[in-house]
Amino acid sequence: MDHADHVGLIRDGVQGAGRRWLELGAGRGAFTLALADLLGPAAEIVAIDRDRGDLASLAATMGRRFPETHLTTVVADFSRDLPMEPGFDGLLAANSLHFVRDPAAVIDGVLPLLRPGARVVVVEYDSDSGNPWVPYPFSYGTWQAIAARVGLLDTRLVGRVPSRFLGAIYAAASDIAASSEPNGTARQTSIGSS
């Protein structure tokens, strides 16, 4: 896959979701660069990865290709608590959640960092069987179940491309409720009457 493929895969999930995004497992940044391209010059992206060298490479590439994008790199394990300010408009997990046994726990753990109405975009191999290089992939059907379990809404397939490795790669988008209630309904408060 090249840059145009990365952009095309996530485009429909990213557009209209705001400009402040958190990315889990950014690596050298193939999808981070696609995100910057889609969000435009006012974008703010926080890229998390355990590999300091990959993040340094990402920062250098971002500076050359998308110098107006505000990129913050954080060396951390995204499966643990992330000490950062909440209020992100979107979360991107592109080919990263297949490295953790329980992707639902990871997503559930980062949801407090997202604003009400935010978007979650996942890119993953469309398979429920892994191998040594991709130990815990999950199909789109499995992602739908995970998303529902953690309270995400309107999960939809936004892109899919064939892959020589595990058949296909898909992108899915889900939304966070626009209110504090998990089903998206506003909490009703009664004020005592006399």
Please provide the spans of the model-predicted regions.
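Short alpha-helix
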Residues: 136-150
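A short SAM/SAH-binding and catalytic strip from SAM-dependent methyltransferases
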Residues: 89-103
